């Protein structure tokens, strides 16, 4: 590829400047990669923490629910569930983390359905299951937001790594090879010119010597 480069001093200067610029860009990309990894480690740790909390809360929800089913009967529970229309709403927006757009998700608490049964007429386990599930909603939303954030950061990290790989595997070798090629041609020309001048000096010297004789 470097054989197609025109071997001139101007090109040598330009290629050296571009090589320095590309080296700076690579360093900036490597710094970005390190920061993204730091963010990812932080969010992954937070995700694991919230995930475990949600797991524990959902276990309590299911335990209460199963006890309610045993007490009320599955048909009564299903009848209560089917009487309710889907009402939960969330809002989303975008925030920027180190140049990466990530989602923020908020649960509209006013859309959480009110308890569709009487505490007096139904099993206390059903009420307990409802309250525990209501408390778990915010954690679940937080978990979804963290997962989306991690996905966005991983995607940006992969793009950054691809750019670094491209610089390492293609761009830097091209410029280094081109600079080496131009330098070699210019040095060869310089040696040829020096040899030519030496020959001319000898010829002129001989002529002077012949003329003086």
UniProtKB/Swiss-Prot annotation:
Localization annotation: Cell membrane
Quaternary structure note: Has multiple subunits with at least A(3), B(3), C, D, E, F, H, I and proteolipid K(x).
Family: Belongs to the V-ATPase D subunit family.
Annotated keywords: ATP synthesis, Cell membrane, Hydrogen ion transport, Ion transport, Membrane, Transport
HAMAP family xrefs: ATP_synth_D_arch (MF_00271)
InterPro entries: V_ATPase_D
An example molecular function term from Gene Ontology annotations: ATP binding
Keyword Signal: no
Organism of derivation: Saccharolobus islandicus (strain Y.N.15.51 / Yellowstone #2)
Protein known as: A-type ATP synthase subunit D
First-listed, main subcellular location of the protein, grouped into a coarse class: membrane
One cellular component (GO) term of this entry: plasma membrane
Domain of life per record: Archaea
Described function: Component of the A-type ATP synthase that produces ATP from ADP in the presence of a proton gradient across the membrane.
Cross-referenced NCBIfam families: PRK00373.1-3, V_ATPase_subD
Endpoints of the signal sequence: none
Bilayer topology: Peripheral membrane protein
Origin organism lineage: Archaea, Thermoproteota, Thermoprotei, Sulfolobales, Sulfolobaceae
Single biological process term from Gene Ontology: proton motive force-driven plasma membrane ATP synthesis
């Amino acid at each position: 590829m470097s054989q197609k480069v025109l071997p001139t001093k101007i090109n040598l200067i330009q290629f050296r400047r571009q090589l320095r610029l590309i080296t700076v860009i690579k360093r900036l990309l490597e710094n970005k990669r390190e920061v993204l990894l730091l963010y990812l480690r932080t969010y992954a740790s937070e995700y694991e923490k919230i995930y475990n909390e949600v797991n524990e809360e959902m276990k309590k929800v299911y335990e209460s629910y199963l006890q309610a089913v045993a007490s009320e009967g599955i048909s009564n529970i299903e009848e209560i569930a089917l009487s309710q229309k889907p009402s939960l709403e969330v809002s989303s927006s975008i925030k920027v983390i180190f140049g990466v757009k990530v989602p923020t998700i908020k649960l509209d608490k006013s859309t959480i359905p009110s308890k569709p049964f009487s505490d007096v007429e139904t099993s206390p386990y059903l009420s307990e299951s409802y309250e525990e599930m209501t408390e778990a909603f915010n954690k679940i939303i937080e978990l979804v937001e963290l997962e989306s954030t991690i996905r966005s950061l991983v995607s940006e990290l992969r793009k950054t790594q691809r750019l670094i790989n491209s610089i390492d595997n293609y761009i830097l070798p091209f410029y280094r090879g081109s600079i080496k090629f131009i330098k070699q041609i210019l040095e060869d020309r310089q040696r040829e010119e020096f040899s030519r001048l030496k020959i001319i000096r000898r010829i002129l010297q001989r002529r002077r010597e012949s003329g003086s004789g």
